[in-house]
A protein has these predicted regions:
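Beta-strand residues in well-ordered beta-sheet regions across diverse protein folds
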Residues: 39, 84, 117-118
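A short hydrophobic beta-strand element
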Residues: 77-89
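Short, cysteine-centered beta-strand-loop-beta hairpins and adjacent loop/turn segments enriched
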Residues: 61-63, 89-99
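Short, low-complexity N-terminal intrinsically disordered segments enriched in polar/charged residues
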Residues: 1-34
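A solvent-exposed, acidic/Ser-Thr-rich amphipathic alpha-helical stretch
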Residues: 25-30, 34-75
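Hydrophobic alpha-helical core bundles mediating ligand binding, dimerization, or RNAP-core interactions
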Residues: 9, 13-16, 32, 51-55, ...
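Short, surface-exposed coil-to-beta transition loops
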Residues: 66-69, 98-104
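Short beta-strand edge/turn micro-motifs at domain boundaries
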Residues: 80, 100-123
């Protein structure tokens, strides 16, 4: 395992989780490379400036609370780290289960920053 890459990935995923739960994305941007590629099924964003302007959807749902299981990280070498993430959505106020979703997050780490983020819904 390439420990520095895994450490960067783990820190990034922790910060991303906090951003998704609070809507505060400010701690996310310093972890991204200037030429970051951010790829999701809904849209693609390229470059740090575009990320700062367009990642506004990273926020908590209005009527749901979001929980994350601890990410399972796999170091594929060469700065490539993959994580399977399980999310549980609950109704705000009651805590009643709404739904769950599994995602695969594929990261490329370069010079201690996330150079590429690709998220796919897998379940």
């Amino acid at each position: 395992m390439t420990e520095p890459d895994v450490d960067v990935a783990r820190t990034f995923l922790d910060v991303l989780r906090t951003a998704a739960q609070t809507g505060d994305r400010s701690a996310l941007y310093p972890l991204l490379a200037d030429d970051v590629e951010w790829l999701t099924p809904q849209r693609d964003v390229e470059g740090i400036e575009a990320a700062q302007q367009e990642l506004t959807w990273i926020k908590p749902p209005d009527t749901l609370e979001l929980e994350f299981d601890e990410p399972n990280l796999s170091d594929l070498g060469g700065g490539h780290v993959v994580s399977d993430v399980h999310e549980v959505y609950r109704v705000k106020g009651t805590g009643e289960f709404a739904y769950a979703r599994d995602r695969r997050i594929d990261l490329t780490i370069r010079d201690g920053k996330v150079a590429r983020y690709e998220m796919r819904i897998v379940g």
